[in-house]
């Protein structure tokens, strides 16, 4: 590691500890050339996947765009910002842990539907009507029947 004070590459680790969450390591280092001490942090770099849209184009995952989708679906609904933030974080974390470089937009949409179903049934119906391009009242009826049946096998109970 290059010393930030003198630029020397001759540094030694004198202390190394994991943070409380266990997802980063703090290292105390000493430069052999100038004897100054400095701290470095080591974390894993997880890059979100590219989203492959239905027309085949690719775009970077956008947490802002995801939040905006939740905001539109939850417009004038009694759901706290904290709950939305938690849902967005779960989706982001899920996408990161997939380990895939590309994820179909359809898969992101399904994750949003799962989260909205837990947060607010009306928002779920709103989102589903746009996401699944409802054409007639029967499409709404199908979703309402699905909601009335309760959780299905494979639905996340959290």
From Swiss-Prot:
Q: Which InterPro entries match?
A: ATP-cone_dom, NrdR-like_N, RNR_NrdR-like
Instruction: Cite the residue ranges of zinc fingers (unnamed).
Output: 3-34
Positions of disulphide bridges: none
The cofactors it requires, by name, are: Zn(2+)
Q: Which GO terms describe its molecular function?
A: ATP binding; DNA binding; zinc ion binding
Matches recorded under PROSITE patterns: ATP_CONE (PS51161)
UniProt key word Flavoprotein: no
Q: Which Pfam families match?
A: ATP-cone (PF03477), Zn_ribbon_NrdR (PF22811)
Cofactor note text: Binds 1 zinc ion.
Alphabetized UniProt keyword annotations = ATP-binding, DNA-binding, Metal-binding, Nucleotide-binding, Repressor, Transcription, Transcription regulation, Zinc, Zinc-finger
Domain ATP-cone intervals: 49-139
* GO BP annotations listed: negative regulation of DNA-templated transcription
Instruction: Give the matching NCBIfam families.
Output: transcriptional regulator NrdR (TIGR00244)
Function, as annotated, reads: Negatively regulates transcription of bacterial ribonucleotide reductase nrd genes and operons by binding to NrdR-boxes.
* Family according to the record: Belongs to the NrdR family.
This protein's name: Transcriptional repressor NrdR
Which organism is this entry from?
Thiobacillus denitrificans (strain ATCC 25259 / T1)
Taxonomic classification: Bacteria, Pseudomonadati, Pseudomonadota, Betaproteobacteria, Nitrosomonadales
